[in-house]
């Protein structure tokens, strides 16, 4: 999914989902994103922030947001292996950890709890939900607080990208799923 958010002077946000058709968002393939790049560049020139939201039936793509360098290094030292690392603004990082869904009735809850746990430990403790947008690399972070004296904004930088799943996050996901199953069994009694 590609989302464009225009920040209004009064603090309000105007949101536009590029892949929404007939009220449904299905996401874009990498090829479709490439085809839509001219439109995305036009939106940026109009002052809009661009975000990607990875969507998958088979995997969770967990965003860990608002990390400084120390938290990012600790995340990696602790054994987590992000598929993507972005520098969303100078000294501020986002990581995306990919984990296969387990195919149980609790997949949504497992993803949400995994996101909560990782963000409480390493990122933004207020971030919730497994499906969450991250800044689009190669585009500007147009938050007013990041505007430079010359009127420009920092570009979101892609520091790392590889097709990988995180074994440590999968272990945590399995543990959370087992807890969900125990709770469901207890409630059923």
Description of each model-found segment:
Residues 1-93, 98-116, 120, 182-183, ...:
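Signature for HUH/AEP ssDNA processing cores
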Residues 2-8, 115-121, 126, 130, ...:
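A broadly tuned "polar low-complexity/structure-edge" signature
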Residues 20-21, 148-189:
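Long, charge-rich alpha-helical interaction segments
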Residues 69, 141, 163:
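Short, glycine-/Ser/Thr-/acidic-enriched flexible segments
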Residues 97-103, 125-150:
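Short, conserved secondary-structure transition motifs
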């Amino acid at each position: 999914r590609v989302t464009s958010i225009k920040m209004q002077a009064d603090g309000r946000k105007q949101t536009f989902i590029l892949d929404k058709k007939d009220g449904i968002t299905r996401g874009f393939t990498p090829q479709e994103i490439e085809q839509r790049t001219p439109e995305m560049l036009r939106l940026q020139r109009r002052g809009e922030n661009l975000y990607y939201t990875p969507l998958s039936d088979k995997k969770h793509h967990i965003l860990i947001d608002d990390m400084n360098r120390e938290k990012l290094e600790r995340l990696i030292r602790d054994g987590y292996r992000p598929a993507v690392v972005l520098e969303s603004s100078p000294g501020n990082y986002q990581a995306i950890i990919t984990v296969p869904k387990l195919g149980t009735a609790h997949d949504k809850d497992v993803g949400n709890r995994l996101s909560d746990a990782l963000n409480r430990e390493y990122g933004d403790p207020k971030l919730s939900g497994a499906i969450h947008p991250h800044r689009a690399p190669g585009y500007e972070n147009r938050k007013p607080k990041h505007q430079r004296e010359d009127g420009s904004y920092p570009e979101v930088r892609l520091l790392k990208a590889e097709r990988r799943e995180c074994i440590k996050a999968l272990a945590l996901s399995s543990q959370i799923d087992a807890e969900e199953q125990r709770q469901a069994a207890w409630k059923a009694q």
